């Protein structure tokens, strides 16, 4: 369980360079596969980092290695120092094939980071709304979970002007009301986006979508103290 000069467990290098002979040798030393580096990343985090930095060319080998590690008791739901899981990272780095694998291996969709945000919040914040349907397919509850500031994903999407995503969320059963107490800091931050709520129905042609957006906006105007 020693570390190298980069603050990583010694076995990380063998996995990151797919040197499985060395890895098998190290395993005879009873290494802890869930050991983390100085930033509290386990080996799956590091593999993913190498991948999104284009340091891994063989994507099939990369995915099979993640699968083998998880099957060898590496914690797929481990968190780093920011409270992020590998699912959060996969969404943020726009890596769909990794995201699909992790979801298929039953990674915890409801895991939250240090700010209480799920991967559905990440879809909004990281501009990866294209993964909404995929995530919602695996978990229907996640759409309405608020973060530590009292904000649901649909609220952030509306404030950020992501109308298409908001409509998808409404069609999928997202709640149009949010009576949860809001943190004063987030209310102040969101003030700069108030106009997006007031104008949310602009350029929306479909009547049912327009009505649903109007209902959401009316609720949010009251809940977030929005002034026209």
Regions from the PLM with identified roles:
Residues 125-129, 141-176:
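Ankyrin-repeat and related helical/solenoid repeat scaffolds used for protein-protein interactions
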Residues 171-228:
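Ankyrin-repeat-protein effector appendages
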Residues 21-22, 61, 65, 97-98, ...:
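Conserved ankyrin/ankyrin-like repeat signature
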Residues 24-32, 67-75, 100-108, 133-142, ...:
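Ankyrin repeat domain, specifically the short helix-to-loop turn at the C-terminus of the second helix
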Residues 13-19, 46-62, 89-95, 122-128, ...:
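Ankyrin repeat A-helix N-terminal signature
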Residues 10, 26, 33, 43, ...:
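Fold-core signature of tandem repeat domains
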